[in-house]
């Protein structure tokens, strides 16, 4: 990399929180399936509780449906983690005068490319509260703001400010929102 190129990697869905949620949903789904089968067969398949005492038609059947729903949700979560949806890079190239924003999508990669001269400012947005938002985005001429930071867990304020200031300094544009 030369001094005229800045490349930032963006973390996708391969985060610890996503792994923990997918594992919890998977374990819960297996638990519901075993409880449903215990109710149907009349034998305890779980090492705790006494699910064989459940009546199959209302309770066991509903637990079986919960296990199907959990299996579908867990499959989706593990697929999103395997594909690493949302990961990608932000590439700012002064030599060629191009900004390339690329992300991995569900079916195919998403790539946005536009001239460097269209960048008017770097915007740092901080909103605390119930629906907190902390992100760095590009203000573009004739387009809406283009977010650059990852989705999910908000970045620490110091890191957010540092990334925004570094990018604004590199591009030679104003930093807005602080």
From Swiss-Prot:
Its main location: membrane. The keyword Membrane applies. Keywords: Membrane, Photosynthesis, Thylakoid, Transmembrane, Transmembrane helix. It is a multi-pass membrane protein. InterPro entries: PSI_Ycf4_assembly. GO terms for cellular component: photosystem I; plasma membrane-derived thylakoid membrane. It is found in: Cellular thylakoid membrane. Pfam families: Ycf4. The keyword Membrane applies. Belongs to the Ycf4 family. This is Photosystem I assembly protein Ycf4. It comes from Synechococcus sp. (strain CC9902).
């Amino acid at each position: 990399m030369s001094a005229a190129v800045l490349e930032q990697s963006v973390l996708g869905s391969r985060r610890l929180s996503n792994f923990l949620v997918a594992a919890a949903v998977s374990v819960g789904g297996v638990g519901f399936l075993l409880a449903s089968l215990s109710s149907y067969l009349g034998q305890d398949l779980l090492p705790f509780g006494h699910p064989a005492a459940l009546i199959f038609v209302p309770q066991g059947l509903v637990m079986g449906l919960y296990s199907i729903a959990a299996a579908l949700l867990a499959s989706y979560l593990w697929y999103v983690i395997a594909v690493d949806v949302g990961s990608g890079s932000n590439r700012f190239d002064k030599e060629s005068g191009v900004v390339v924003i690329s992300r991995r999508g569900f079916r195919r990669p998403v790539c946005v490319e536009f001239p460097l001269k269209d960048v008017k400012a770097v915007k740092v947005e901080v909103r605390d509260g119930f629906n907190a938002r902390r992100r760095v985005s590009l203000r573009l001429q004739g387009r809406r703001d283009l977010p650059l930071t990852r989705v999910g867990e908000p970045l620490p304020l110091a890191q957010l400010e540092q990334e925004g200031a570094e990018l604004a300094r590199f591009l030679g544009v104003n930093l807005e929102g602080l």
